[in-house]
Amino acid sequence: MAYYKKPFTPKKPVRTFRDLEVYQKTMECAVLISKDIAPALVKQKYPYAERFAECALSVPLLIAEAHSLRFADFALGVGFLEKAMSASNKMIVYLEHARGLCGSKLDQSLIEDIVGRYAVCRVKMFHLEKSWKRFRSEYDDDKEKKGTGGFRY
């Protein structure tokens, strides 16, 4: 029987969206893409280079918006988190497409690393969504109609 060997350390409380691990990790990916991959794609005349860079930055942007909106309109906040998960999937598709088209002209290990990071972040965003929903039901926010302000964006 295997036991978890690392000592337990509680996570730092989340005060802003910048404290969310999924925000931090997807921002790291966006920086790596803008710095290392996007210029190489422009050189190779990759047809979707601009969309590629925009999509990379959209993931942390959507996470930040979701974190803020969940207090005003919970359903809208969760919807933005769903969009962030979708954008993570899109980034994996863009990265694999670029790797297929450009091949050895791109850093294959970097692309594989970023694909793995996006896949892990996608799962963590799903767990974050479940956590938000659990928190909402534990504190009876759904029964008291908190977060249903009909927020329009």
Feature-to-residue mapping (PLM):
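Amphipathic alpha-helical assembly/interaction segments
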Residues: 1-153
